[in-house]
Amino acid sequence: MKVLTELQKQIFTIVKKENGKPIPPGIVVRMMENSPNFPGKHLIYRAIDDLLDWAILRKAGGVTNQLLVNYEPAEPLLDKKLQGILTLGNKNSGFIRSLDDDKTVYYVHYSNLTGALDGDLVEFCKLDKPQFGDKFDAAVITILKRARILYAGNFLVDQNEFALEYKIVADNPRFYLTMIVNPDSIPNNLASNTKIAFQIDEYDPDNNLCKVSVQQVLGNNDDPLINIKAIMLDNSIVFETNDVVEQHANKLSFDTEEQHKAYRQDLTDLAFVTVDPTTSKDLDDAIYVKTIPTGFVLYVAIADVAHYVNRNSEIDIEAKHKTSSIYLPGHYVVPMLPEQLSNQLCSLNPAQKRYVVVCEISFDNQGRIKTNKLYPATIISKNRFSYDQVNKWLNNKSELNCDETVINSLKAAFTLSDLIQAQRQKRGTIDLSHKETEIVVDEHYFPIKINFLVHDKAETMIENLMVVANETVAWVLTNNKIALPYRVHPRPSKKKLQSLIETVGELNITKPQFNLDTVTSSQIASWLNENKDNPSYEIFVILLLRTLGKAFYSVNPLMHFSIGSNHYTHFTSPIRRYIDLTIHRLLWMHLFTPDQFTDNERDQLKQELEKIADTVNDTEIKIINCERNANDYLTTLLLSKQIGKTFSGFISAITSFGIFMRMDENNFDGLIKITTIPDDFFIFEKEKMVLKGRKTNKVYKIGDRLEAKLSEIDFIQKRAILTLI
């Protein structure tokens, strides 16, 4: 943390006494000239520069660059030290969520970071100053553990008349430390403009300096695929499979031992099919539906990954570390499991015998569940369909090349899906569907265009059948008093709901009548449906998504609010999600073949569940950030060829530094900086989430339609900069 010298304190006091009125640096010097200990102009200007560098003072702007107070420092309260995780914002101030108390969140100014970076585990303390809003100020005392070992950056060589100067520019804009590159770490003939991975060897917290060394050469900085790998590295994502793990996987094969017949049902005669995106290779799930006089019987067959991946094996250890497959733009996939398993042995490829775990559910003619069974089985998928194929068949645009039994099963599946959908809506499932896009790339991974995704009937059918299977498995395990990781989504807080209601009120969205303390998912769903025809419905859904927050895994049996379910888990994707694989192991250990496992093995897994859930939750956030960063990078790369083009859109967010406009053409948010908005000086009113002109009272609010010109691309922030027309 920065400790001000007496000279810096004097300068700060002079600026503060102006009570918000800008003061020129020269006036500060003049006011100090009569001091008996006048240090000289040079030292005063240097001290002012330090206060500006530390963001304790700021420039008011304009030609004169007059000084204003930006942040008031305070003494640290070192008698109580806490621990927490640091999250940095774009201006390199941040927040620490304490791990020691009730998860209180503290604000940390840039001058109090002490060299800590985004995601670091730190020891910190409160500052001796009043609470501001709902947060106390804090300062980092020391870094307990860096969030990552390697960081991605661009290696540059500057050659002047005297010597070569080596520089690294970090990809992450939140990496604020000034780097000194160890020349001995630089490989021979390493070219300028090369993407590399570096590590911090030493750091000076008082001056925000660090010594770094090159650890890995990724490739040409202008290569999009190299940049995607750098994004994964910066998010601590493993994008290569361990050679030892590959070797173990390659030794596995489909076995046909007689012992399987004792506990596996033979369902190879049933007309199972898979329906997935066109590019999918890891086919987790197959379905078969038959009609009976009293309703329907649904068979959801899920790849039996647990049969091949033993706990604590080399393959399992890596899968547990990865926690999930990653799907990046341009169909770039980083599988959780080696391809021998994910695309071959476990994938439910057509015309191949495969081991599965089946969730069999019988429904009445209204789509209400009557009975359920869970058991291991063997199936043969009769066909591999894409969503596009099935949707075209539904719309009578093409035929499916398959047997009549498959056609009958698909027809029954769609009828059942509609009934399940009606039951889900009745109990309060919230429809949060909104516009989504995909980036199309060429063979060199350069972006070509952005397409809007279509979520049609085939996608909805599979989603409904998977949701009911996931929920059924959660209920069966819960009713058998078996501990499991639930997928949970708590009720939104009263404060967040109140803020949402006030914001969407400006969009002519009807004011809901529900109680904010006891609101149900049914009431939220009804509120959405009431406004389906509102022109601002799309932004309403976006704001509601932000209000509801993110679902996560927990060993506590909490509700999944947006689905409207009291017990929910993930069972249907064990090839690509470690939680699902864990659920399968629980089924084997407790329900399918309990005699093949010891009580100690069951207890070990039970004790590990919370750690598994926490690890997956943490990694899921990194994966989401990775996917967002990759999307932003490729979108801005595509937009860089459209400088000067005019876009229409609506305001999707408002901040103290500007307006984010979601462009209709590509569904991407561009930034209109507050300093570039013409005709007035605009003030951010946080309570109302608007920008308001000081002279004209003109207001910009969320949902407003705008036109703006693309003026530049900020590749560091991966951001499109727009100018209002």
UniProtKB/Swiss-Prot annotation:
Under the heading InterPro entries, the entry gives: CSD, NA-bd_OB-fold, RNase_II/R, RNase_II/R_CS, RNase_II/RNase_R, RNase_R, RNR_Ribonuclease, S1_domain
Alphabetical list of SMART domains matching this protein = CSP, RNB, S1
- The S1 motif domain, residue ranges: 644-725
Query: What GO CC annotations are associated with the protein?
Result: cytosol
**This protein's record includes keyword Lipoprotein:** no
One Pfam family assigned to this protein is: RNB
Please give the name of this protein: Ribonuclease R
Species, as recorded: Mycoplasma genitalium (strain ATCC 33530 / DSM 19775 / NCTC 10195 / G37) (Mycoplasmoides genitalium)
